[in-house]
């Protein structure tokens, strides 16, 4: 995962003074890799959590292009978890047909559905009703020529102050990227065919790694937690989640509110543990307590993995912990 926002150094920074707290940004999740819609839902959860913590309403519109109701999508279960957990804060609209098509296969129906979705988006942007508007798969709609790019860019650039816009999908137009405050690119990284065992597709779990210099890795993981909880809801059985954080012993991180919102809505499905000091850990300046905390969290992780209690375990900031030895 890469992005165009400027990083502030090595280590973990308490986020209370971070620009990620600011509102009204335009986020773009782009690229060939998976997880773009999942990351957007993580941002939605964070926004709802911040609204709860600050005792203000943070209403969200999830507007999905090119995702008709004829087939299920990976993020459907996460959206169900959001709607059940925060029923008065989420509006959800789907447009388009579900099958894949190319630019030379665009029909009048496709254009009409794209225009219907964009008209809903414009109304939502102008309404002052929403804190966040998610325009899922808007990028490929623009790439297919189904909407006028200049009109979309002008409307988004002139959005009301305080309104956060999240756009997902491959092939983001350069003119849209230029007006964004955060552009994250998801890139697939091959590690061999881990999805198959003895010629059969493996369906019972796996390992997903979110890495890179860009922001949004923890947010993407929260989207995965939502997806896991939603699967448990739809299958009418427990799908317990453990969120275990390294290098985050303090308070004020951007995902804190999202995790708290999850725990309040699904107290029997989400466990959360954190480790480390409330400080940046620099290479060559590690303190004994850093090693103790890292080992403590890893022992908890191993026990959780072996326990059979959890269907999803998020090991947040494990990568830099290992990198710092």
Over which residues does each language-model region extend?
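Extreme N-terminal, non-catalytic leader segments
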Residues: 1-25, 198-207
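Short acidic/polar alpha-helix capping motifs at helix-coil junctions
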Residues: 6-9, 120, 137-141
């Amino acid at each position: 995962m890469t992005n165009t926002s400027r990083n502030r150094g090595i280590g973990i920074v308490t986020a209370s003074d971070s620009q990620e707290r600011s509102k009204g940004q335009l986020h773009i999740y782009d690229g060939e890799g998976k997880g773009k819609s999942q990351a957007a839902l993580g941002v939605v959860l964070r926004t709802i959590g911040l609204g709860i913590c600050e005792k203000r309403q943070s209403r969200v519109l999830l507007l999905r292009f090119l995702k008709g109701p004829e087939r299920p999508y990976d993020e459907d279960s996460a959206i169900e978890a959001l709607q059940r957990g925060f029923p008065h804060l989420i509006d959800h609209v789907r447009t388009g047909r579900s099958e894949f098509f190319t630019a030379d296969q665009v029909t009048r129906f496709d254009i009409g559905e794209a225009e219907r979705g964009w008209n809903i988006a414009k109304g939502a942007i102008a309404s002052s009703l929403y804190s966040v508007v998610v325009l899922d798969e808007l990028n490929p709609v623009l790439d297919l020529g189904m909407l006028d790019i200049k009109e979309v860019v002008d409307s988004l650039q002139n959005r009301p102050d305080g309104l956060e816009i999240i756009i997902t999908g491959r092939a983001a137009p350069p003119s849209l990227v230029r007006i964004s405050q955060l552009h994250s690119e998801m890139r697939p990284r091959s590690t061999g065919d881990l999805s198959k065992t003895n010629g059969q597709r493996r369906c019972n779990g796996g390992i997903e790694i979110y890495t890179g210099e860009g922001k949004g890795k923890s947010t993407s993981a929260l989207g995965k937690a939502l997806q896991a909880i939603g699967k448990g809801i739809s299958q009418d059985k427990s799908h317990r989640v453990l969120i275990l954080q390294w290098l985050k012993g303090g308070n004020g991180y951007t995902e804190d509110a999202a995790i708290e919102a999850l725990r309040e809505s699904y107290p029997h499905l989400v466990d959360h543990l954190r480790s480390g000091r409330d400080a940046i850990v620099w290479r060559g300046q590690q303190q004994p307590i850093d090693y103790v905390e890292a080992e403590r969290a890893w022992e908890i992780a191993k026990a959780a993995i072996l326990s059979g209690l959890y269907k999803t375990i998020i090991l947040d900031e494990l990568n830099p912990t290992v990198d710092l030895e």
